[in-house]
Amino acid sequence: PAPLAPLAFILRMRTVPLRNLGACIAPDNSWLFLQGIETLPLRMEKHCANSLAVAEHLEKHPDVEWVRYPGLKNDPYHELNQKYLHGKGGSMVVFGIKGGAAAGKKFIEALQLFSHLANVGDAKSLAIHPATTTHSQLNEEQQRGAGITPELIRLSVGLEDPADLLEDIDQALAAAK
């Protein structure tokens, strides 16, 4: 109908560009964003060093089935990591805990320093059990198709002292038995 045409046009002009381009960022937020960009290389050095320490520690731990981190020499993506990331494996470490989903849930609940959050790349260390959180709406077959297994734990390693991170992981692995 003709009377609704202007309203439809107005709504389209407000929603489509917002969806495609995003909202304008506030000046204060822009300043904070720029401050973060300035220190990003320093933070990434610490993220990568901490992640490698965590991955190497987990690789030797008796309660861990497997570890995936491109900074490890035996990781299937190690060569690509060397080529494209100059040997810096990033801050994500994924591992399989012995005991499956039940152990994974206990591990997450026992962590004290790591936060139980789904976002990644924070200055704080984060941990999640994807099978019971981010991918819980999928059945087991769909989860496996997405690369999510019952024992999988995903860590986003932050900037804390590596000794503190390893201590928290060790106590949580002990509690998960």
Question: Model regions: which residues?
Answer:
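Active-site C-terminal subdomain of aminotransferase-like
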Residues: 1-92, 96-108, 113-124
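PLP-dependent enzyme catalytic core of the Aspartate aminotransferase-like
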Residues: 43, 102, 109, 125-177
